[in-house]
């Protein structure tokens, strides 16, 4: 079941998903024929339900996913009552607590259906306690990679603690770069901490093999890293390798959007038009990156090349280079749309370059004083960043205000991710 779960998650192969569905109940039946006095009896059944729930979410089967999460949670709670010292219960309960603790308000019905209260802080405590066991007790070693994967994904998306990301990155580099799934985690973690050179080094260690599921998303990540370094030739080649080989739907529009950006920056007008048409024709607008790509091509906004290059350098962690370019831009030549991004990018660079708290906050406040006539994500994101600044200062009252302000915005790019981060921030403070 685990192999099917990973294959479906990685390849997004809908036909394989449909083909394997009937096997879920057959596998559960086999598990139920085992020793009922074992702590693995209910735990293993919960694993099956959780894996299928995550796969169903990938294909938007939300109601069935909610049902399966409820089944998994009830089995785990029952198992915890029967075997309170069985540490592996905390693995899945921890994941569920974190994910449900950050769930957007429009999906609160899932919490009601499952009857589980999310708690981000206690969820992380659960997972780190399991990781400790996997490292120190031989019989739990086989779960170490999985727990590191969960923690990496959740630390990237649910918390803003650089040291935690560094610690997980070091663990992966020490033990696990033979696993493409953990290569993916290491690449994303190094990008999150702003070290694009390390991301490239990690991805360049991937060796193709006929024995592995093709993980084409690694080509996408490699292309992104080359784009951040302004290596347009290699970036274009890797994006094309991704779109020509990956048979799923996610990141296709995003990849073609990046190809159109490369064409714009290299003055290849015909190729830009070709790639923009592909954005509208191929892939689906399910994940935030693809929604953004489709919106951008439909808006037909006039981009500023220097501002775009500064954005790419920023995303790759080349912060001083990005700031140097921004400081060379004539602000009076920017339209209102681009001027908003200019102020936002300055504020974010002040953060990354460790300017004083007052300089950072003043830069964000300057942006928020502008009129949000384009419904841009820079405004809710600025409120979110202000909240995070206050949270680090342990000024919980001010942080709560700005997390709540973030949640009041609607209909903007990256809305799901930004609101999830704001909700997670609220819950972190309220948990304490």
Regions found by a protein language model. Give the residues of each.
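Alpha-helical adaptor scaffolds
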Residues: 145-152, 156-157, 191-192, 307-316, ...
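Solenoid-like repeat scaffolds
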Residues: 33-36, 81-82, 112-117, 132-137, ...
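Generic helix N-cap/helix-start motif at coil->alpha-helix transitions
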Residues: 38, 86-87, 105, 140-149, ...
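"A position-specific structural signal for the A-helix of alpha-solenoid helical repeats
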Residues: 3-6, 44, 48-51, 92, ...
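Residue-level detector of the short coil/turn that links helix A to helix B
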Residues: 60, 67, 159-160, 194, ...
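Short coil/linker segments at helix-helix boundaries
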Residues: 2-174, 291-295
């Amino acid at each position: 079941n685990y192999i099917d779960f990973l294959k479906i998650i990685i390849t997004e192969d809908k036909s394989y998903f449909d083909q394997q569905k009937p096997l879920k109940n057959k596998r559960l039946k086999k598990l139920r024929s085992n020793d009922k006095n074992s702590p693995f009896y209910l735990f293993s059944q919960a694993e099956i339900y959780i894996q299928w729930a995550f796969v169903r979410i990938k294909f938007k089967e939300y109601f069935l996913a909610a049902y399966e999460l409820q089944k998994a949670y009830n089995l785990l709670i029952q198992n915890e009552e029967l075997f309170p010292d069985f540490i592996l219960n905390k693995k899945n309960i921890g994941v569920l607590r974190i994910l449900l603790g950050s769930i957007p308000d429009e999906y609160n019905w899932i919490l009601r259906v499952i009857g589980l209260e999310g708690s981000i802080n206690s969820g992380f405590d659960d997972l780190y306690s399991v990781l400790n066991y996997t490292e120190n007790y031989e019989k739990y070693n086989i779960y170490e990679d999985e727990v590191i994967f969960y923690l990496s994904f959740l630390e990237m998306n649910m918390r803003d603690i650089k040291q935690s990301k560094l610690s997980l990155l070091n663990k992966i580099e020490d033990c696990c770069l033979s696993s493409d799934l953990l290569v993916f985690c290491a690449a994303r973690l190094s990008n999150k901490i702003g070290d694009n050179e390390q991301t490239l080094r990690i991805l360049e260690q991937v060796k193709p093999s006929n024995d592995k599921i093709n993980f084409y998303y690694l080509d996408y990540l490699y292309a992104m890293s080359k784009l951040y370094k302004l290596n347009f030739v290699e970036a274009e080649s890797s994006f094309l390798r991704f779109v020509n080989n990956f048979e799923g739907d996610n990141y296709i529009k995003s990849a073609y959007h990046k190809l159109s950006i490369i064409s714009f920056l290299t003055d290849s007008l015909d190729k830009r038009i070709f790639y923009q048409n592909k954005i509208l024709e191929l892939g689906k607008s399910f994940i935030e990156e693809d929604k953004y790509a489709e919106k951008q091509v439909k808006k037909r906004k006039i981009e500023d090349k220097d501002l775009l290059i500064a954005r790419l350098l920023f995303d790759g962690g080349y912060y001083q280079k990005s700031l140097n370019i921004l400081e060379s831009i004539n602000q009076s030549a920017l339209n209102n749309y681009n001027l908003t991004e200019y102020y936002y990018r300055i504020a974010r660079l002040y953060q990354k370059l460790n300017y004083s708290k007052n300089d950072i906050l003043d830069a964000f406040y300057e942006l928020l004083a502008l009129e949000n006539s384009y419904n841009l994500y820079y405004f809710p994101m600025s409120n979110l960043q202000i909240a995070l600044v206050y949270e680090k200062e342990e000024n919980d009252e001010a942080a709560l205000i700005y997390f709540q302000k973030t949640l009041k915005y609607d209909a903007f790019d990256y809305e799901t991710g930004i609101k999830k981060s704001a909700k997670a921030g609220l819950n972190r403070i309220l948990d304490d």
